[in-house]
Amino acid sequence: MINLIKIPSLIIVWATALTACGGGGNDSVAPSTSFAQASKTPLVPGTTPVTTPDATLGTAPGTNPGTTPGTSPGAAPLAAGSEPVAGNAMGNFFIPAAAQAVNTRTPARTIGTGTPESCTSAAVVIAVAQGGVITFNCGTNSVNIKMTSTAKVFNDKPDVTLDGGGLVTLDGGGTTRILYQNTCDSAQVFTSNRCDLQASPKLTVQNLTFRHGNSVGQTEEGGGGGAIFVRGGQFKIVSSRFFNNHCDAVGPDVGGGAVRVLGVPTVFPVYVVSSTFGGAAGLGNECSNGSALSSIGVSYSVINSLFTHNEAIGTGANPAQAGKPGGGSGGAIYNDGNFFSLQLGGSIFRDNNANEGGGAVFYVSNDRSGTLAIDTSTFARNLSRGFETVGFPGFFIIAAPGQPSSTSSTFSLG
């Protein structure tokens, strides 16, 4: 039985299924993380926020969580200016070795020769196509690189690490998807007859800002991924920011205004570490579903990150209906499929909205085998205009029995 709150009438509904649930992929690899059962407390406006024991979030102001081994991404701080910095500075959730920043001290190639003018879209496209560790030398100040074409990873080249040093913005100009990896795209070279199950290439983006990426009208693999689209291999985001990225406004499964991931085996979770999606009014990402992160059958570990002002703007949920083309679920995150996991640690989700279900997070494991773990995280003012799970405002959850697990986290509507 699924315990739901129906918005805006706030009528509690009991159901065994919901039309918001879409079909999804499945991988046969078991997850390496086990999750404990958590209690659920109904919450309606005016009641006390749900708080699991010892609710805290990170270190005290003025301290540096990066000095503790295992908690620092090892990345350069971003030049913030008047914009939000990368990540939740108060988050101190443990960062495993696989999730930490790649060492870029000896790059395979460097974009730029020391001036902003030398850092061009063409230079980024060429460097990514060649692969390897890539850094930038665009001068000592922040630089905005207008991407006039998409940088694409070639599957037969070395793993790509793209490190902006905290100074580089890749800007899609509202017309261009910025970065693309697809192990099942013959144009990027097939390296396996099981392209969805291969472990390479590995794509890492760190110390970068992705702005105004746009995949509207991109129909391959179902679309989505305004800033970054990934199918297959492995993928990691460290100390990066995503502002004003967009994908299609309608569609039952299209998603990822910022990031769309498909076909990554669940044994290789997508790591999102110390990164910001939106972060302030006017900077949020937007798509039919999952405006920050969207995937089908892919596991995630989201650590010490910030998600605000992202909005799922589709209508009609899933499947599409007459007069309602579908979508509108998962203001920040949309995870659909069968067997996969989602871990949220040391992160803040605030002021995200969904026209249908899950103002912050839409998590649906159609065969009820998936797991959702929430640790030392805060969820506030995430509006679900259609439906959500009782006791977890801003969430819609269908998962394995006893899920989600929640430790030292807070959930509130105000």
Which ranges hold each PLM region?
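Extracellular beta-strand-rich solenoid/capping regions of secreted or surface-exposed proteins
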Residues: V125, A129-Q130, K146-D163, T169-Q206, ...
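Sec-dependent bacterial lipoprotein signal peptides
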Residues: M1-T19
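Bacterial Sec-dependent N-terminal signal peptides
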Residues: A17-V44
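The right-handed parallel beta-helix/beta-solenoid scaffold, focusing on the short coil/turn
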Residues: G132, V143, T150, P158-V160, ...
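Right-handed parallel beta-helix
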Residues: G164-L167, S200-N214, Q234-D248, T266-G284, ...
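N-terminal pre-domain segments of enzymes
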Residues: G70-A108
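Acidic/polar low-complexity surface segments
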Residues: L179-D185, G213-G222, N244-G255, V261-L262, ...
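Acidic Gly/Asp/Thr-rich repetitive segments characteristic of extracellular carbohydrate-active
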Residues: I111-T135
